[in-house]
Amino acid sequence: MISAILDTGALVGWLDEDDQWYAFASTHYPQIRSLALTCDVVIAEASFQLNDVPDGRDRLLEMVQTGALHVLSVLPEESGAVRALLRCYGQRMDYADACLVRLSEIHRHHVIVTTDTKDFRVYRRFRREPLPLLTP
């Protein structure tokens, strides 16, 4: 079983059968422990992307309500670390990515499940450690 931190693309892929990442997500979700982590901004992004998916947003929030997905907020406690990540990576990193990298620093035994291989292969924990990733 995998202890996971979920990115937007992986979540949307799991909940939308028409999404390009559905096969990836549906293959790997059975391996993920029931308590996956994500951050609040990923929920906002996924909710927006699932707007036109029948029951997509409802199923997303059901995962939160049932405890299958634990949503963490990194602000205000981790604002200094998030700011440092955003400064380090500049325009390449958005706020959601910075939050996920910070969660990976805090929850060191979790794997980030993402479809964004381009950026997450560049990001580092503590500026030097490659992130543990599960990607397509």
Residue ranges of predicted features:
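Metal-dependent nucleic-acid phosphoesterase active-site entry motif
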Residues: 1-19
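Acidic, PIN/NYN-like endoribonuclease modules and their adjacent C-terminal/linker elements
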Residues: 1-3, 106-136
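PIN/NYN-family metal-dependent endoribonuclease catalytic core
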Residues: 5-6, 24-52, 66, 71-74
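Terminal helix-to-tail segments of small alpha-helical proteins
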Residues: 8, 17, 59, 64-65, ...
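Alpha-helix/helix-capping structural signal
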Residues: 9-10, 41, 77, 118
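Amphipathic alpha-helical segments within well-ordered protein domains
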Residues: 12, 44-47, 83
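Residues that scaffold the ATP/ADP-binding catalytic core of kinase and kinase-like folds
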Residues: 14-15, 49, 123
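Active-site neighborhoods of divalent-metal-dependent phosphate/nucleic-acid chemistry enzymes
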Residues: 71-115
